[in-house]
């Protein structure tokens, strides 16, 4: 089949790769001049299938109220006049219950674990390189109450068969030796040994080259205007370079997905949650991380990417903004200086990206009420973690193949 994919982030490119492997003729369209130049460009770098946890969780409303008055809060709420923002926030609040948390986390772990397996298989098949490491993730707790409160997460990990270790201070230092100088800054940690790290931008560009070798065509610098309909199905994509037609269409536009499909009567409650990162060259190996360390207090991930440290995180609900506030940079600097002062922060680059978040933190993967229109979007902070699994899953669904994992609860129908 001829299939057009809208979006060349890590989700769009992995989808293109898996569709091409199944023999389809694939074209990818994007407004940027190359792959992964928006949200996939400088994310935190961790592939954490065992760590996914919904932002909508019991206790989050109270925590969010407290964070409003903190200088280095992990969540920043900047209200706008957009009613979409208020509706999304109300939907998120509705998911802050014990029952919804368990359902949503189980969905997330299912997709993420499958995606990690797909990534490993892809790596074996292609030999792709992207500064990858397979040395686990350490969630670091600065306060005892944080360590004492991981019972629900451990319950879900056990239920889903995800290996984990609860570590004391010495155990944390054993897996991340550079923490020896900061033992007074934390009380313990939760380690997920099967997690990985890697540069999402490098991966996406390398996979795009591989996909081109399989026949995928990329059309960059092309603005997507609208989806055209005829006879109850999608008949084409109106772009700045004319109308593009295909047999099947995939929308993988992250936070911009809702605007494109709204005219079709489809509701995708995906809202941009802004994240920040800095990337610094390593100047002191003894004070740099081995893999990824998650600073629970600031919701920040500190990741080793080759000879660089990537520090990323926070969640800012402020709409489609691209500013780089000094206060956000200060929070990133504070966390990494506290724990891993081995990077040259004076030489660091500062970046922000709009992470496409659903109210239940679960991505939208699957078909729509239009037989030839599919969606792969809304992965929030876990686009890199879930990319390969999401791409392969959707490729199987489009091709009519039996999916490797349950997919019926991942589609847009749960909102419409």
Curated annotation (Swiss-Prot):
Pfam families found in the cross-reference section: DAO
Pathway in which the depicted protein is active: Amino-acid degradation; D-alanine degradation; NH(3) and pyruvate from D-alanine: step 1/1
Any one Gene Ontology molecular-function term assigned to this protein's record: D-amino-acid dehydrogenase activity
Record's catalysed reaction(s): a D-alpha-amino acid + A + H2O = a 2-oxocarboxylate + AH2 + NH4(+)
InterPro entries: DadA, FAD-dep_OxRdtase, FAD/NAD-bd_sf
GO biological process: D-alanine catabolic process
Cofactor requirement: FAD
Presence of the UniProt keyword Flavoprotein in the record: yes
UniProt-annotated binding residues for FAD: 3-17
A GO cellular component entry from the record: plasma membrane
E.C. code: 1.4.99.-
Keywords: FAD, Flavoprotein, Oxidoreductase
Disulphide connectivity of cysteines: none
Broad class of enzyme this protein falls into: oxidoreductase
UniProt xrefs under HAMAP family: DadA (MF_01202)
Record NCBIfam families: PRK00711.1 (NF001933)
Similarity comment text for this entry: Belongs to the DadA oxidoreductase family.
Function: Oxidative deamination of D-amino acids.
UniProt-recorded name of the protein: D-amino acid dehydrogenase
């Amino acid at each position: 089949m001829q299939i057009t994919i809208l979006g060349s982030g890590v989700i769009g490119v992995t989808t293109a790769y898996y569709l091409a492997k199944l023999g389809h003729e694939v074209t990818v369209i994007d407004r940027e001049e190359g792959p992964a130049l928006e949200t996939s460009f400088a994310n935190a770098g961790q592939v954490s299938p065992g760590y996914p946890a919904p932002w909508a969780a019991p206790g989050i409303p109270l925590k969010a109220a407290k964070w409003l008055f903190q200088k280095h809060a992990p969540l920043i709420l900047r209200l706008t006049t957009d009613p979409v923002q208020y509706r999304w926030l109300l939907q998120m609040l509705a998911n802050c219950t014990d029952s919804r948390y368990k359902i949503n986390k189980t969905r997330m772990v299912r997709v993420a674990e499958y995606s990690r397996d797909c990534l490993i298989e892809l790596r074996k098949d292609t030999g792709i390189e992207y500064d990858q490491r397979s040395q686990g993730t350490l969630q670091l707790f600065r306060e005892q109450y944080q360590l004492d409160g991981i019972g629900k997460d451990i319950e879900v990990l056990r239920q889903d068969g995800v290996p984990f270790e609860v570590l004391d201070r010495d155990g944390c230092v054993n897996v991340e030796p550079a923490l020896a100088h900061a033992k007074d800054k934390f009380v313990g940690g939760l380690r997920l040994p099967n997690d990985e790290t890697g540069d999402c931008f490098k991966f996406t560009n390398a996979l795009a080259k591989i996909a081109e070798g399989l026949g995928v065509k990329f059309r960059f610098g092309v603005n997507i205007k609208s989806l055209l309909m005829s006879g109850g199905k999608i008949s084409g994509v109106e772009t700045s370079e004319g109308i593009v037609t295909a047999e099947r269409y995939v929308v993988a536009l992250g936070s911009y997905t809702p605007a494109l499909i709204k005219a079709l009567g489809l509701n995708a409650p995906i809202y941009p949650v802004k994240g920040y990162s800095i990337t610094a060259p390593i100047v002191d190996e003894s004070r740099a991380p081995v893999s990824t360390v998650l600073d629970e207090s600031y919701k920040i991930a500190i990741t080793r990417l080759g000879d660089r440290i990537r520090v990323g995180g926070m969640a800012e609900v402020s709409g489609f903004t691209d500013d780089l506030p000094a206060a956000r940079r200060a929070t990133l600097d504070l966390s990494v200086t506290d724990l891993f002062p081995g990077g040259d922060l004076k030489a660091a680059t500062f970046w922000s990206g709009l992470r496409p978040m659903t109210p239940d933190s679960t991505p939208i993967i699957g078909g729509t009420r239009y037989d030839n229109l599919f969606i792969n979007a809304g992965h929030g902070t876990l686009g890199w973690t879930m990319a390969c699994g999401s791409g392969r899953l959707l490729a199987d669904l489009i091709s009519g193949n039996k999916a490797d994992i349950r997919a019926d609860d991942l589609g847009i129908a749960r909102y419409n």
